């Protein structure tokens, strides 16, 4: 095939949502020449659904993206209108930050970053076709018949792939927020031999702030104590003048309106065929599935400082517009609310993720990567996490460097990608803390400790950031050593002070570290005995020290499990393995192995339907193969 390339790039990223911007920024910062193509340049890093970043598990992902050198955390720290630490009454493994965003300002701030990035070209154009020769990506073709050469292509199209918006009996071709749908590219991905699924998501109506009666709702303020997503943000820049959210509820009248109109609900009439998100169901789905519930929470979330639009979180729906209006007016505080936008469902094509490697490159086509909702996930944070990994690995592939694969013990991003490529997904995938078996070591307070060194090695962490990280790490290490070296003895003077502070007296000599391990003892209590550290420690380092010491036993057990799994991950499975050549494995295991083609014993062991006996047989088979290869090599000598 002869192509007429008018421009040449190392990497072309299709789609400028949260996955696309992270992918393009990472690759360009690693020295690649990148084109970021978007259907609508005004929607770069736009939030078509909830105006927030973070939340349970998701907030940790944002910090992981930041630790690797990504941009989401920095941008939300510049544009939030409220910041809140969730689950403060629970253990450290499930705590996470959540920010209400000024969604318009967030998009503008991210666009400024993209436009000013060296090696990165931003262009409004529709990509209709990915050009492939001999199983390798060579470029793309646009709707205006322009051909651009590329060594790698990253598809981050979100819900635009053959997108269709549904409101009642109205159904029309559209991407998110009524943008153009990408039809030809959806056809092209099928023609390239990729297996395609069909998912659905939805969004609630927006109401006018000045028409809400806030007096009958419950205020939900942000935190006064400073917190940030990015490790580069400063406490002195923390926004004090935050915008509150408000809590209200559905009621019996609301539920009756929905029940009386289920015959008009696309979810139940067969109009919606795509699979929806389990953990973010529509309000009509909730009313049917949880019929015993008298009410459901609804949060009224402002979409920014300079807009009247308020997002009604928890009221996602595709009911007809007249029913939505009645439903809104049945809710306390919204009796006279003006609906500014109608809620809708959107169906879209996605690439079944078992076809991907852990680098997010497709197994079928060399140089073709996918990330974000294209892979069947939901959420801006999940998209950003995949985007930065796809961008990094596309750049590393072009540069001939070793790939970056995050393990499940490295971060929630690693958990998510492993789940996708190993287990696949039959519904929009959402990250949850329960998905991570090592969640006690994958906390919000240690993402930089886990991943900054990786970011530095691949070239995404600059000298200033690295110096700050080294200072923090040294302060942490030095204080941990100090606490382990100083002893508190059960002498009269010490015990008098211990009892005065309300603690049980010492019976044996203990280190300061052991004393801090007591649940009721804080770091400041220990300092009262041993004096402060040589350097001033900020609250974040103190929090990290306390968590590491108080949960040391559990963390140690988790690290033992990580070591065992690492040994399994190091046992590679040949890419050309003949699964039919292995005797005695169960039929289901053989079928799953053929479908997913696991790359390591560890990955094979996590495939649903594969049992320990199948793994044992596989290991025996591989050991036999290795012995026979060794014998052949010895004979040839």
From Swiss-Prot:
Which PROSITE patterns does this UniProt record tie to the protein?
A: GIDA_1, GIDA_2
**Gene Ontology CC annotation, any one:** cytosol
Similarity annotation: Belongs to the MnmG family.
PANTHER family xref list: GLUCOSE INHIBITED DIVISION PROTEIN A (PTHR11806), PROTEIN MTO1 HOMOLOG, MITOCHONDRIAL (PTHR11806:SF0)
Identify the residues that bind FAD: 15-20, 127, 182, 373
What cofactor does this chain's UniProt record say it requires?
FAD
Q: Where in the cell is it found?
A: Cytoplasm
The record's annotation in Gene3D superfamilies points to: FAD/NAD(P)-binding domain (3.50.50.60), GidA associated domain, C-terminal subdomain (1.10.150.570), tRNA uridine 5-carboxymethylaminomethyl modification enzyme MnmG/GidA (1.10.10.1800)
Q: What's one GO BP annotation on this UniProt entry?
A: tRNA wobble uridine modification
Cite the binding residues for NAD(+): 276-290
Keyword tags:
Cytoplasm, FAD, Flavoprotein, NAD, tRNA processing
Task: State the NCBIfam families in the record.
Answer: mnmG_gidA (TIGR00136)
Which GO molecular function annotations are given, in alphabetical order? flavin adenine dinucleotide binding
Q: What Pfam families does UniProt report for this protein, alphabetically?
A: GIDA (PF01134), GIDA_C_1st (PF21680), SAM_GIDA_C (PF13932)
**Subunit structure comment from the entry:** Homodimer. Heterotetramer of two MnmE and two MnmG subunits.
In Swiss-Prot or TrEMBL terms, this protein is called tRNA uridine 5-carboxymethylaminomethyl modification enzyme MnmG
At the top level of its lineage, which domain of life is listed? Bacteria
Q: What does this protein do?
A: NAD-binding protein involved in the addition of a carboxymethylaminomethyl (cmnm) group at the wobble position (U34) of certain tRNAs, forming tRNA-cmnm(5)s(2)U34.
């Amino acid at each position: 095939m002869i192509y007429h390339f008018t421009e040449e790039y190392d990497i072309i990223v299709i789609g400028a949502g949260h996955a696309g911007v992270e992918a393009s920024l990472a690759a360009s910062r690693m020295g690649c020449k990148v084109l970021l193509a978007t259907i609508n340049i005004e929607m770069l890093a736009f939030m078509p659904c909830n105006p927030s970043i973070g939340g349970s598990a998701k907030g940790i992902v944002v910090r992981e993206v930041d630790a690797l050198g990504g941009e989401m955390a920095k941008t939300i720290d510049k544009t939030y209108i409220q910041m809140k630490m969730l689950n403060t009454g629970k253990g450290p493994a499930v705590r996470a930050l959540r920010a209400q965003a000024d969604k318009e300002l967030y998009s503008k701030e991210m666009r400024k970053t993209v436009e000013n990035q060296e090696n990165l070209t931003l262009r409004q154009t529709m990509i209709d076709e990915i050009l492939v020769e001999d199983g390798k990506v060579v470029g793309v073709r646009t709707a205006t018949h322009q051909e651009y050469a590329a060594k790698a292509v990253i598809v981050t199209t979100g819900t635009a792939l053959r997108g269709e918006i549904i409101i009642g009996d109205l159904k029309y071709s559209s991407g998110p927020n009524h943008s153009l749908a990408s039809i030809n590219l959806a056809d092209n991905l099928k023609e390239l031999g990729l297996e395609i699924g069909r998912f659905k998501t939805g969004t609630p109506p927006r109401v006018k702030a000045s028409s809400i009666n806030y007096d009958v709702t419950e205020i939900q303020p942000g935190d006064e104590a400073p917190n940030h997503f990015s490790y580069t943000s400063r406490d002195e820049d923390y926004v004090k003048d935050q915008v509150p959210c408000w809590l209200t509820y559905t009621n019996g009248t609301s539920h009756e309106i929905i029940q009386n109109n289920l015959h008009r609900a696309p979810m139940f009439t067969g109009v919606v065929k795509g699979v929806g998100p389990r953990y973010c169901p529509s309000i009509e789905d909730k009313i049917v599935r949880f019929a015993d519930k008298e009410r459901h929470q609804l949060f009224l979330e402002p979409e920014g400082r300079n807009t009247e639009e308020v997002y009604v979180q928890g009221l996602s729906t595709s009911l007809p517009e007249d029913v939505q209006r009645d439903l809104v007016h049945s809710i306390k505080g919204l009796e006279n609310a003006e609906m500014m936008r109608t809620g809708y469902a959107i169906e879209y094509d996605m690439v079944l993720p078992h076809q991907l490697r852990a680098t997010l490159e497709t197994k079928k086509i060399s140089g073709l990567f996918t990330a974000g909702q294209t892979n069947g996930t939901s959420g801006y944070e999940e998209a950003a996490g995949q985007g930065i990994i796809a961008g990094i690995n596309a750049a590393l592939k072009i540069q001939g460097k070793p790939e970056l694969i995050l393990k499940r013990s490295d971060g929630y991003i690693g958990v998510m990608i492993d789940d996708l490529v190993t287990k696949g997904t039959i519904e929009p995938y959402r990250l949850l803390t329960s998905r991570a078996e090592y969640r006690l070591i994958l906390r919000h307070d240690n993402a930089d400790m886990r991943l900054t060194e990786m970011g530095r090695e691949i070239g995404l962490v600059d000298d200033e950031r690295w110096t700050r990280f080294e200072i923090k790490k040294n302060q942490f290490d030095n204080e941990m050593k100090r606490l382990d070296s100083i002893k508190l003895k059960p002498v009269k003077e010490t015990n008098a002070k211990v009892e005065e502070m309300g603690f049980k007296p010492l019976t044996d000599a203990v280190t300061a570290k052991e004393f801090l391990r007591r649940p009721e003892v804080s770091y400041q209590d220990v300092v009262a005995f041993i004096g402060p550290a040589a350097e001033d420690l900020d609250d974040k380092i103190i929090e990290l020290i306390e968590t590491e010491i108080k949960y040391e036993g559990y963390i140690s057990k988790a690290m033992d499990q990580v070591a065992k799994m690492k040994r399994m991950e190091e046992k590679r499975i040949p890419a050309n393995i003949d699964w039919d050549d292995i005797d005695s494995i169960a039929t289901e295991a053989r079928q799953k192995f053929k479908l997913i083609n696991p790359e390591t014993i560890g990955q094979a062991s996590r495939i649903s339907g594969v049992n320990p006996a199948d793994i044992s047989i596989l290991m025996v088979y591989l050991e036999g193969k290795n012995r026979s290869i060794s014998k052949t090599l010895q004979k040839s000598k």
